[in-house]
Each structure stands twice: as structure tokens, then as C-alpha cells.
């Protein structure tokens, strides 16, 4: 269900409190391992810019810049806490310790391939 990113960012939830915002891995609904499928969409309500994420990975980490406070950027810009959001397609955290998670193990000679597409647009 769509909602604003900030809606629950200060929720009374242990994981949100520990991370001081979102730093969560979401399990993506896949029909089969390695399937390229939709993962997430964000939209800026002011500019109407959108970003959609498609990936072959089983998980999507969302991080809301919870520790950016005062980080300096280009041209003298300063980034305050929570002034960014990241969508990182990846395997599940702690995968090697959970045999029922999709494997992330690579043996010598193995090739690892994944695809992530970030699609930008404008939507009224």
C-alpha cells in the first residue's frame, strides 16, 4: 500500500528505533529465483519525479540516510539527517546462517550475475 516514506519513520518499533529510521531489508515476491521483477517505486509529490526499481535479487534494502547529519557535499551543500533514501538490491542479510534463504555462496570459478534497473520518470 503506498505511503509517504516519513509516515512511520519515528514509529514506536524496536528496529526503527535502533536504526534511527529505516534500514530494512524487504523480501521481494518472486515467482522464481533470478526473475527480473518490480521491487519498489518512489515519487516526489512536488516535482512528480518517479523512480522504479526492478531487480533479479531476492531482497531490497531501504535506508533513509539516518546518520547523514552535517555531511558535506559538492559546492558547499550540507546534507541533514534523513535527507536521502537508498534502495539497494541485494541478498538477505546474514544469509550464510540461514539455510532456507537464497544462497549467496560462490565457489572458486563461479560467476555471480544480477541485474538491477533504476527507471526514472515524471508522473502527474
Language-model features, listed with the residues they occupy:
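Active-site pocket scaffolds in enzymes
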Residues: 1-124
Amino acid at each position: 500500500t503506498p505511503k509517504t516514506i516519513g509516515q512511520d519513520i519515528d514509529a514506536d518499533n524496536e528496529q526503527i528505533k535502533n536504526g534511527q529510521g529505516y534500514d530494512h531489508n524487504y523480501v521481494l515476491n518472486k515467482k522464481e529465483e533470478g526473475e527480473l521483477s518490480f521491487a519498489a517505486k518512489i515519487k516526489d509529490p512536488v516535482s512528480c519525479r518517479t523512480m522504479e526499481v526492478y531487480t533479479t535479487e531476492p531482497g531490497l534494502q531501504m535506508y533513509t540516510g539516518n546518520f547523514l547529519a552535517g555531511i558535506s557535499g559538492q559546492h558547499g551543500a550540507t546534507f541533514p539527517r534523513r535527507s536521502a533514501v537508498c534502495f539497494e538490491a541485494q541478498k538477505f542479510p546474514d544469509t550464510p546462517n540461514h539455510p532456507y534463504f537464497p544462497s549467496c555462496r560462490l565457489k572458486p570459478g563461479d560467476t555471480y550475475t544480477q541485474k538491477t534497473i533504476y527507471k526514472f520518470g515524471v508522473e502527474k
